Design a protein with these regions (language model features):
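Conserved Radical SAM active-site core
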Residues: 1-121
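Auxiliary Fe-S-binding modules of radical SAM enzymes
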Residues: 112-213
């Protein structure tokens, strides 16, 4: 369940959260397993959703000034907030998916440090099930697939992630951002999950899902 975030102090927060619970129950009634990513949650909210969701998620995004600048008007995306959420999920024992947003101006060392931070958290808490390696793409109506240099860079990040993260953590990258013929290279580098393949990618709607013959 993906949702727009509602500020903790908002008068709409209670009804928003009640809807998340109701949709989780509906998914279970339809014999589906919900996975909620709804932004930062209080301990009480996360614990309540965890009783209905086999797993949950929230992107770490990354470390460094590039992310601070990107999210300067989004307080819920501050690094300390995101890290606190990952730690809270670990204390509650919630199986969790997180990830990095790549290509926003971060350095190679910052990528490595973010992966090592997640690896350390996994060794302490044991709750991280998957890390998404999400290349940033420009919005708008026109898609711009990864260029060959961008593909090569992402393959290096995948290989780095596979070396730095514990082996039980799965690695995901969105298949619609790659040329179809280049996906085998991503799998060889360490990707073992191509994520959700829906009719429309809600994160990158201008990028159609691959339709191999």
């Amino acid at each position: 369940l993906l949702s727009g975030e509602v500020a903790p102090a908002s008068s709409e927060r209670a009804s928003w959260f009640a809807r998340l619970l109701a949709l989780s129950r509906l998914a279970l009634a339809e014999q589906r397993l919900p996975h909620t990513n709804a932004g930062p949650l209080s301990r009480r909210e996360m614990a309540a959703l965890a009783r209905l969701n086999p797993s949950m998620g929230l992107m770490l995004e990354g470390l460094g000034a590039a992310y601070d600048a990107l999210h300067r008007r989004a307080p819920s995306k501050r690094l300390d907030v995101r890290l606190a959420q990952l730690e809270q999920a670990g204390r509650l024992g919630v199986p969790f998916t997180t990830g990095l947003l790549l290509g926003v101006g971060e350095t190679w060392d910052q990528r490595r440090d973010a992966l090592r931070l997640l690896a350390d958290m996994q060794r302490r808490r044991g709750h991280l099930q998957e890390v998404i390696l999400q290349p940033w793409r420009p919005g708008g109506a026109s898609a711009r697939p990864l260029s060959p240099p961008e593909q090569a860079d992402l393959l290096e990040v995948i290989s780095l992630a596979r070396r730095e993260l514990p082996p039980e953590i799965h690695l995901q990258t969105p298949p619609n951002l790659w040329p179809w013929e280049a996906l085998p290279a991503a799998l060889e580098a360490g990707i073992d999950d191509l994520g959700g393949i829906d009719a429309v990618d809600v994160i990158n709607p201008a990028y159609p899902q691959p339709l191999p013959e």
